[in-house]
Amino acid sequence: MSRVYEINVAKSKFRDAYNAGNLDGLLAVFADECTDMSAGAPSFFGADSKSVFRSRMTRLFEECRATLTVTVIAIRVFANTAFDYGWHSLTLMPRDGGKPITTRQRYFETWQRNSNGEWKIDFYIDNVDVAPMMPGADLPIPLAFCPPDTQRQRDQKLARAM
């Protein structure tokens, strides 16, 4: 079995566990010592990362039914290390009957092959996807690179345009 195929199988287990609300199945895809840099949340490292992830996902699965669609753009393998990147489209249906919420995130993961030959995610980072634009378009400057005054001016300009 090819290593790329093995990563695809592990990624499918990730998706299937997410969609089933299977916390143990979801956590099984992650290394015991990992890094989580999920958008909109503090970063966590090592054993704390998996513990915090467990708490977050327990709450999420209690409050919502989740439907995760994974689009893998590429998987690159280098011996016992690999990375993949793509999109996660997540629809959350509140269990209390509220309206569903759908988000699309760009993600990047690194994988390590452990001593049992299993591929585990040891680094995860994502951010909100944005609409594609042509290179010649009036591309926005990422807010992370803007001084606070520029952000404020940009927010005011956007508010006037709405």
Regions found by a protein language model. Give the residues of each.
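A solvent-exposed, acidic/Ser-Thr-rich amphipathic alpha-helical stretch
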Residues: 2-10, 23-80, 87, 102
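Short glycine/acidic-enriched loop and turn motifs that connect beta-strands
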Residues: 90-91
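Short beta-strand edge/turn micro-motifs at domain boundaries
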Residues: 104-138
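Short, low-complexity N-terminal intrinsically disordered segments enriched in polar/charged residues
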Residues: 1-33, 80, 132-162
